[in-house]
Swiss-Prot record:
EC number of the protein: 2.7.1.148
Binding site for ATP: 96-106
Pfam family membership, one: GHMP_kinases_N
Family to which this protein belongs: Belongs to the GHMP kinase family. IspE subfamily.
Residues that span the membrane, as ranges: none
Source organism of this protein record: Pseudomonas fluorescens (strain ATCC BAA-477 / NRRL B-23932 / Pf-5)
Top EC class, one word: transferase
Keyword Transferase: yes
Name used for this protein in its record: 4-diphosphocytidyl-2-C-methyl-D-erythritol kinase
KW Transferase (keyword) present: yes
Active site (record annotation): 13, 138
């Protein structure tokens, strides 16, 4: 049965740890990181059109239509598949831009998977992930939809099964420039690689944290406040800060104390993304 319209979630991710092993000749950094999803994110609605036009109806401040990763993902998939159909796209955006929780990458992956379904292309996960990698290093993990240990620039993925606590995520009102952090001379770039799987507990360090905390007082403040209740971590290069709790009630309790002065949300960690659970339910 063909569908005309489809609404899919576009979940956030956390980097439970992030180690920087060195800088490559192409300027990118060799990383090791552990990705986990949150049952929290944007919602994207797709509606088929038969004239081949790709149109995103939701405007993003400061982002031209054709520069949006959602539009880029749709156009690349259309070009490479030879599909003659078009798509109308709307997004209910709640994930912050530049927060380190994968908003743009997740949107691109949801677009690839949603259009593969609506356009009935029959592309497998490997092919979609390879296309996703041309859009951004974090897109493949969202395409594959499973918590993973990532290496290289983040594209070599091994499934992992970390605990799935409740998280309180704080969102400092500042956008961190990833390029700025990775070019900081004080950034640690020589962490020894982790060679055992699963990733041993206790490897929860983010090598970007000292640099981000030094440059951005808003992030430093969030880390200090959350750190009074649980281990406070940085996801990606920030700006979002998070901590795990054994129950929703405990996360909610701390959230009530901290969100008087800080923006934040409580969400369940998940090793299978809510996007993939939704797609499975459509089969």
């Amino acid at each position: 049965m063909s569908m005309e319209k489809l609404t899919l979630p576009s979940p956030a991710k956390l980097n439970l740890m992030l180690h920087i092993l060195g800088r490559r000749e192409d300027g990118y950094h060799e990383l090791q990181t552990l990705f986990q999803f949150l049952d929290y994110g944007d919602e994207i609605t797709f509606a088929l059109r038969d004239d081949g036009v790709i149109r995103l109806h939701t405007a993003f401040e400061g982002v031209p239509h054709d520069s949006n990763l959602i539009v880029k993902a749709a156009k690349k998939l259309q070009e490479q598949s030879g599909c003659t159909q078009g798509i109308d796209i709307w997004i209910d955006k709640i994930l912050p831009m530049g927060g380190g929780i994968g908003g743009g990458s997740s949107n691109a992956a949801t677009t690839l998977l949603g259009l593969n379904h609506l356009w009935q292309l029959g592309w497998d996960e490997d092919r979609l992930a390879a296309l996703g990698l041309t859009l951004g290093a974090d897109v493949p993990v969202f395409v594959r939809g499973h918590a993973a240990f990532a290496e290289g620039v983040g594209e070599k993925l091994t499934p992992e099964y970390p605990e799935e606590p409740w998280y309180l995520v704080l969102v400092p009102q500042v956008s961190v420039s990833t390029a700025e952090i990775f070019s900081d001379p004080l950034l640690t770039r020589n962490t020894a690689p982790i060679k055992v799987r699963p990733v041993p507990k206790g490897n929860s360090r983010n090598d970007c944290l000292p640099v981000v905390a030094r440059r951005y007082p808003e992030v430093r403040n969030a880390l200090n406040l959350l750190g009074k209740f649980t281990e406070a971590k940085l996801t990606g290069t920030g700006s979002c800060v998070f901590g795990g709790f054994p129950s929703k009630a405990e996360a909610d309790k701390v959230s009530a104390l901290l969100t008087e002065t800080l923006t934040g949300f409580v969400a369940k960690g998940s090793n299978v993304s809510m996007l993939h659970r939704k797609l499975q339910s459509l089969l």
